[in-house]
Amino acid sequence: MVILLGPLLLVFMLGLGLAPLSLAKDEDRYTHFLTQHYDAKPKGRDGRYCESIMKQRGLTRPCKEVNTFIHGTRNDIKAICNDKNGEPYNNFRRSKSPFQITTCKHKGGSNRPPCGYRATAGFRTIAVACENGLPVHFDESFIITSQ
């Protein structure tokens, strides 16, 4: 019996050791999500805004075709991952309330910098993928405009 418990204990201890690694990975994915899609207080919401922020965030090597920035608080965005401001939507969570957003679309041409972008500002509900209560992926294809 003692011999059987040894390997079980080892597996249990390894599992405990891997849990922090998994949480750290989720934090990294959340940080990446924020870098790509979060801008609390945009300075203007036109083409120059898009060209500037896309370059600052490292999204122009190569020029990213489409990227949306969410303007709100981190807590409001995180709340989509629970029932406070989110609801299930396929494999994602859809926000119950609209967010102010800016979508930057590449004007075309070369995918090498300098990248030109068109900005579309608006309010809409958004869909995100969540892991351990944190948003880790923004669904660019989900578009429902608010009334």
Curated annotation (Swiss-Prot):
<dbReference type="GO" id="GO:0005634">
    <property type="term" value="C:nucleus"/>
</dbReference>
<dbReference type="GO" id="GO:0043066">
    <property type="term" value="P:negative regulation of apoptotic process"/>
</dbReference>
<dbReference type="GO" id="GO:0005737">
    <property type="term" value="C:cytoplasm"/>
</dbReference>
<dbReference type="GO" id="GO:0005615">
    <property type="term" value="C:extracellular space"/>
</dbReference>
<keyword id="KW-0346">Stress response</keyword>
<keyword id="KW-1015">Disulfide bond</keyword>
<dbReference type="GO" id="GO:0030139">
    <property type="term" value="C:endocytic vesicle"/>
</dbReference>
<feature type="disulfide bond">
    <location>
        <begin position="63"/>
        <end position="115"/>
    </location>
</feature>
<keyword id="KW-0378">Hydrolase</keyword>
<dbReference type="GO" id="GO:0004549">
    <property type="term" value="F:tRNA-specific ribonuclease activity"/>
</dbReference>
<dbReference type="InterPro" id="IPR001427">
    <property type="entry name" value="RNaseA"/>
</dbReference>
<dbReference type="GO" id="GO:0019731">
    <property type="term" value="P:antibacterial humoral response"/>
</dbReference>
<dbReference type="GO" id="GO:0061844">
    <property type="term" value="P:antimicrobial humoral immune response mediated by antimicrobial peptide"/>
</dbReference>
<dbReference type="InterPro" id="IPR023411">
    <property type="entry name" value="RNaseA_AS"/>
</dbReference>
<feature type="signal peptide">
    <location>
        <begin position="1"/>
        <end position="24"/>
    </location>
</feature>
<dbReference type="GO" id="GO:0010494">
    <property type="term" value="C:cytoplasmic stress granule"/>
</dbReference>
<comment type="similarity">
    <text>Belongs to the pancreatic ribonuclease family.</text>
</comment>
<dbReference type="GO" id="GO:0050830">
    <property type="term" value="P:defense response to Gram-positive bacterium"/>
</dbReference>
<feature type="binding site">
    <location>
        <position position="45"/>
    </location>
    <ligand>
        <name>tRNA</name>
    </ligand>
</feature>
<dbReference type="InterPro" id="IPR036816">
    <property type="entry name" value="RNaseA-like_dom_sf"/>
</dbReference>
<dbReference type="GO" id="GO:0071425">
    <property type="term" value="P:hematopoietic stem cell proliferation"/>
</dbReference>
<feature type="active site" description="Proton acceptor">
    <location>
        <position position="37"/>
    </location>
</feature>
<keyword id="KW-0732">Signal</keyword>
<feature type="disulfide bond">
    <location>
        <begin position="81"/>
        <end position="130"/>
    </location>
</feature>
<keyword id="KW-0652">Protein synthesis inhibitor</keyword>
<dbReference type="GO" id="GO:0042803">
    <property type="term" value="F:protein homodimerization activity"/>
</dbReference>
<keyword id="KW-0255">Endonuclease</keyword>
<feature type="active site" description="Proton donor">
    <location>
        <position position="137"/>
    </location>
</feature>
<dbReference type="GO" id="GO:0045087">
    <property type="term" value="P:innate immune response"/>
</dbReference>
<feature type="binding site">
    <location>
        <position position="104"/>
    </location>
    <ligand>
        <name>tRNA</name>
    </ligand>
</feature>
<dbReference type="GO" id="GO:0001525">
    <property type="term" value="P:angiogenesis"/>
</dbReference>
<dbReference type="GO" id="GO:0004519">
    <property type="term" value="F:endonuclease activity"/>
</dbReference>
<dbReference type="GO" id="GO:0032055">
    <property type="term" value="P:negative regulation of translation in response to stress"/>
</dbReference>
<protein>
    <recommendedName>
        <fullName>Angiogenin</fullName>
        <ecNumber>3.1.27.-</ecNumber>
    </recommendedName>
</protein>
<keyword id="KW-0964">Secreted</keyword>
<keyword id="KW-0540">Nuclease</keyword>
<feature type="binding site">
    <location>
        <position position="46"/>
    </location>
    <ligand>
        <name>tRNA</name>
    </ligand>
</feature>
<comment type="function">
    <text>Secreted ribonuclease that can either promote or restrict cell proliferation of target cells, depending on the context. Endocytosed in target cells via its receptor PLXNB2 and translocates to the cytoplasm or nucleus. Under stress conditions, localizes to the cytoplasm and promotes the assembly of stress granules (SGs): specifically cleaves a subset of tRNAs within anticodon loops to produce tRNA-derived stress-induced fragments (tiRNAs), resulting in translation repression and inhibition of cell proliferation. tiRNas also prevent formation of apoptosome, thereby promoting cell survival.</text>
</comment>
<keyword id="KW-0963">Cytoplasm</keyword>
<dbReference type="InterPro" id="IPR023412">
    <property type="entry name" value="RNaseA_domain"/>
</dbReference>
<dbReference type="GO" id="GO:0043025">
    <property type="term" value="C:neuronal cell body"/>
</dbReference>
<dbReference type="GO" id="GO:0005730">
    <property type="term" value="C:nucleolus"/>
</dbReference>
